[in-house]
């Protein structure tokens, strides 16, 4: 992510597009700290330094993923608004279009729920890593091997699986939700215009 997301509500298409432009689709991530972290090897020589880096890294990632989760909830709110809009349309001949939209909206909602579930699990993993990294910095030398092993395991989980997986899903879901939300109002306007034109004939 190139720019830190601000806390304002992103409801208009322009605000949403501005946010999406700040994302890196080539390498979706919640920060650039991962690149620096991978250069740190877990060994007794720099173990405490690694624990400190891991602690700082996870703290930053928690902030970024929290911002993403809020954006997903806002996207879901927009989706519900557009669902209500489509249900209220007075065009009787547009049942097929409405059915397609509602079906897509249902699929997007499932994706949003899935992303929130992954977000919850990722937070649990981050909290565990934070605890391990913090305790490692004050542990006795006889306990270092244990914390060192745990930190290495958590780093592997985050770098090879969890971070890249959830990042790609969040970006993909935001793209789908954005496209569906942007098309909903257009479909509604077209259907209403067609209905009014038919009444005049």
Curated annotation (Swiss-Prot):
Keywords: Chromosome partition, Meiosis, Nucleus. Transmembrane segments: none annotated. Disulfide bonds: none annotated. It is found in: Nucleus. The keyword Nucleus applies. Signal peptide: none annotated. One of its GO terms (cellular component) is nucleus. Its main location: nucleus. GO terms for biological process: chromosome segregation; karyogamy involved in conjugation with cellular fusion; meiotic cell cycle. Required for correct meiotic chromosome segregation and recombination. This is Twin horsetail protein 2. It comes from Schizosaccharomyces pombe (strain 972 / ATCC 24843) (Fission yeast).
């Amino acid at each position: 992510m190139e720019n830190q997301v601000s806390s304002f509500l992103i409801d208009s298409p322009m605000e949403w597009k501005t946010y999406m432009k700040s994302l890196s689709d080539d390498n979706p991530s919640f920060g650039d700290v991962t690149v620096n972290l991978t250069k740190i090897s877990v060994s007794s020589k720099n173990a405490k330094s690694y624990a400190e880096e891991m602690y700082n890294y996870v703290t930053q990632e928690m902030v970024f993923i929290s911002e993403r989760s809020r954006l997903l909830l806002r996207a879901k709110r927009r989706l519900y608004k557009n669902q209500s809009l489509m249900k209220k349309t007075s065009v009787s001949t547009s049942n097929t279009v409405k059915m397609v939209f509602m079906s897509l909206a249902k699929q997007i909602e499932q994706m949003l729920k899935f992303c929130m579930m992954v977000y919850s699990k990722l937070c649990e993993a981050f909290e565990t890593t934070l605890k391990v990294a913090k305790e490692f910095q004050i542990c006795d030398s006889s306990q270092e091997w244990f914390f060192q092993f745990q930190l290495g395991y958590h780093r592997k989980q985050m770098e090879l699986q969890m971070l890249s997986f959830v990042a790609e899903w969040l970006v993909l879901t935001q793209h789908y939700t954005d496209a569906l939300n942007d098309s909903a109002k257009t479909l509604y306007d077209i259907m209403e215009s067609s209905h009014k034109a038919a009444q005049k004939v």
